[in-house]
Amino acid sequence: MPVRQLPETVVNRIAAGEVVERPASVVKELVENAIDAGAGRIDIFTDGGGRRRIGITDDGGGMTKADLALAVDRHATSKLDDEDLLRIRTLGFRGEALPSIGAVAKLGITTRHGSEPHAWSLTVEGGRKSAIVPAALTQGTRVEVSDLFYATPARLKFLKTDRTEAEAIREVVRRLAMARPDIAFTLAGEERAPVTWTAALPGAAGQLTRLGDILGADFRCSAIAVRAERDGVTVEGFAAAPSLTRANALGQYLFVNGRPVRDKLIIGAVRAAYSDYLPRDRHPVVALFVTTAPQEVDANVHPAKTEVRFRNAGLVRALIVHALKEGLAREGRRTAANSDGAVLTAFRPAAVPRPANWDWRQSPASPVGAGPWSGGATAAAFAAPGQTAFDVGAPSADVRSDPNPVADLIDRPLGAARTQIHETYIVTQTRDGLIVVDQHAAHERIVYEKLKAALERDGVQRQILLIPDIVELDEATVEKLIDRAPELEKFGLAIESFGPGAVAVRETPSLLGKTNAAALLRDLAEHMAEWDEALPLERRLMHVAATMACHGSVRAGRILKPEEMNALLREMEDTPNSGQCNHGRPTYVELKLADIEKLFGRR
């Protein structure tokens, strides 16, 4: 077959395959055009998941009649100078998206520029343009796309259900709305109820408002502001507290010079920053905005511009890690579970039907045991064999000598301990509310931070066992543990082989007190089996510290004396990142007095 020049319509359809993959691609290109045109409000409507119809109206600058005629031609744009490809400041090119859409769908454009006496309208069907005619429109541009892929029926077979395509459109609009909180967006369609995001005020407060509207109230309540800057690159945004996580990384958003992008760079950087706070199977929610000179980032890696390439990717990654770590350390005691809707709902009484003549005085009473303030059995339980004590500092000495410790401690950040419930949770009173502390989670974080500090300082102090503990394990596990013995020794855990199927434990970390060496070694072996060989030594050591902290912490079900509860609270106040345990769970929840009064109808 001889070589021949393809018709223009065929060329456009081939080009459209790179830009217009699905209805969401059309919405992305058209909304980006509206943003570039200076729109303050953008309305999007879809029908049939965008397959039957897509309509986008903006109040931007619009186009003149001459510009409209050129905008639907390939390689025609108002957004580039001759040599601007390496300094792109806009989101898209009208001459890139519109011809591609017009090649595979029925396209209608109505637009009015401020210099024109009226609007102009143009249609494109299968790549063929109509004449430009006068139309009615106050200001801006209205674009309507119908019968998507009618000119390329084979592409229709690859589309998902209307609901799935509508959800993809929604995600595209969500990302663009997060990138531009100063623009009002409305998204409507037959698939779901309309949603409107009003324009937010300039600055970080407005940005957080928009992020909260899209990512939810939980994110807004737990969001931590982060920022880092170096060598002309700025990273800023908001990160959720470690107690707000997801099962995947879909809640991590990256914007580069106002452009939403997907990049594996952020996933690795965020994982590194949160490594001290979350288990490996949980992912935090973050929204980060990178600003840099246009020539420092290549936005033309992909025709759809969903990926970028940084000239100095290492610097960007380092800034992301630094910004997140600094923010998390600064807000270490914050938790996502403070006075949010879920906590209030849990406190509201359930609607349990009772007889009209029900009298609480005639109901059977539950036996009431001695509370922790009564001593006696409490002290004996605390001294039970096998339990690990935590340090009792100076504040607890005051508690023992003061008959009314609440008055002295109520103004502390975590207040004064009032009681312990279910031998697991400490209830404290603060000046403006109450706090419930998970004693195991809280002490686990304290022990973990102490192990880290000791490792950085001069090593973890050890306690020599008079009689070594012999732990029987399978041979493969023994081999793995012995291979990692030098790393374990850094934490004061000295082990050696004791035959083909056993390990002798000769020294344990003093911080752990009396610990179950067999259970500790088995847990360590399980975690080591999951390690990637490429995992850096520092990360391996932190995994060891986390496992040891779990075993060396005060357990749920252990009764505490009041001085011990208050000592734990004071240690929490002095410990970085004490708002979450090593697994990302909150160590406490707080309920403000105002919220309590609402529950009882006093407000």
Swiss-Prot record:
The keyword Transcription regulation does not apply. Signal peptide: none annotated. It comes from the Bacteria. GO terms for biological process: mismatch repair. GO terms for cellular component: mismatch repair complex. GO terms for molecular function: ATP binding; ATP hydrolysis activity; ATP-dependent DNA damage sensor activity; mismatched DNA binding. Keywords: DNA damage, DNA repair. SMART domains: DNA_mis_repair, MutL_C. PROSITE patterns: DNA_MISMATCH_REPAIR_1. This protein is involved in the repair of mismatches in DNA. It is required for dam-dependent methyl-directed DNA mismatch repair. May act as a 'molecular matchmaker', a protein that promotes the formation of a stable complex between two or more DNA-binding proteins in an ATP-dependent manner without itself being part of a final effector complex. Belongs to the DNA mismatch repair MutL/HexB family. This is DNA mismatch repair protein MutL.
